[in-house]
Structures are given as C-alpha cells and as structure tokens.
Swiss-Prot record:
This is LYR motif-containing protein 2. Disulfide bonds: none annotated. The gene is lyrm2. Its main location: mitochondrion. It comes from the Eukaryota. It holds the Pfam family Complex1_LYR. One of its GO terms (cellular component) is mitochondrion. One of its GO terms (biological process) is mitochondrial respiratory chain complex I assembly. Keywords: Mitochondrion, Transit peptide. The keyword Transit peptide applies. Involved in efficient integration of the N-module into mitochondrial respiratory chain complex I. InterPro entries: Complex1_LYR_dom, Complex1_LYR_LYRM2.
Length: 88
C-alpha cells in the first residue's frame, strides 16, 4: 500500500484554488480600501473586511464559500464604483 507524502490536513486542488481566490479577493479589497480618502472610513472598512473574513475563516462548505466570494466581489465592485464617482 502506497503511503501519501502529503500531510493529513493537505488541501485538495479545488480547496487550494478556492483559497487562492479568497486571498486574492482579500488583498484586492484591502488595496481598494487604501484609496478611501477619509481615515475614519478607511479604518471602518478595513476592520469590517478583516472581521468578515475572520468570521468565515473556518467555513468548509464549498457552496457557501462560493456565495461569500460572489458577495465579496459585489462589495468590492460597489466600493470601486463609489470611489470612481467620488474621483478617488
């Protein structure tokens, strides 16, 4: 019987790719938040994003994760549109 060299907690390919999407989305969100002109708004948005991602960190349901990624993309695009309208 062949023994796997992977650690028992290794992610599947699908999980790995989904994790990369989430990390990329988080970084894009943080970069976009840096463009917000007011420091208090930036802090609020940064804390909100961090709390949302941390709260859902342990979620393993693939469908729920896909839904959350979609919602986060919508929030990111809405923030980008708002910043574009504000001229930032």
């Amino acid at each position: 019987m062949a023994v796997s060299r992977l650690p028992p907690a290794a992610l599947s390919l699908k999980q790995f790719l989904q994790r990369q999407k989430v990390l990329c989305l988080y970084r894009d969100l943080q970069r976009t938040i840096r463009r917000v002109p007011h420091e208090s708004d930036r802090k609020y948005l940064r804390d909100w994003a961090r709390d949302e991602f941390r709260r859902n960190k342990s979620n393993t349901d693939q469908d729920a994760i896909r839904m959350m990624i979609s919602q986060a993309h919508n929030h990111l695009e809405e923030l980008r549109r708002s910043l574009a309208l504000a001229g930032c």
